[in-house]
């Protein structure tokens, strides 16, 4: 995967879906998008139903007000649904939505740090 950069903020309070969504929805609306990234710099990740059997991470390309748009065709990611080794699922109205640091991002960071250390050790960097 070539997608590396994500947008993060520290002030995104957990919110809820305004209406239910099915597993192929390409956008969703929450009760309050305040504090979430807007995607203008980089895509960001949210988690739906954290801790539930149907927990799903979603790569989001943009947010306008309370409406989030699911990423598609960004850096080799064909769909942002079921991101970070989760599965796309249906979620009911009032399902919890939170901003999250995902394992894919942490793996990308780890690989980049490792690669740079190897280059430094080799005297290339």
Outline where the language-model segments fall.
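Generic detector of low-complexity/intrinsically disordered segments
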Residues: 19, 61, 103, 121-124
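Glycine-centered flexibility motif
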Residues: 24, 51, 94, 123-124
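N-terminal regions of proteins, emphasizing targeting and processing segments when present
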Residues: 25, 101-104, 113
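Viral virion structural and adsorption modules
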Residues: 1, 110-125
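Intrinsic-disorder/low-complexity loop/linker signature
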Residues: 66, 76, 96, 104-106, ...
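Flexible linker/loop signature enriched in Pro/Ser/Thr and Pro/Gly
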Residues: 84-106
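Intrinsically disordered, low-complexity regions of eukaryotic proteins
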Residues: 51, 58, 86, 104, ...
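Autoprocessing Asn-cyclization modules and mimics
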Residues: 1-81, 111
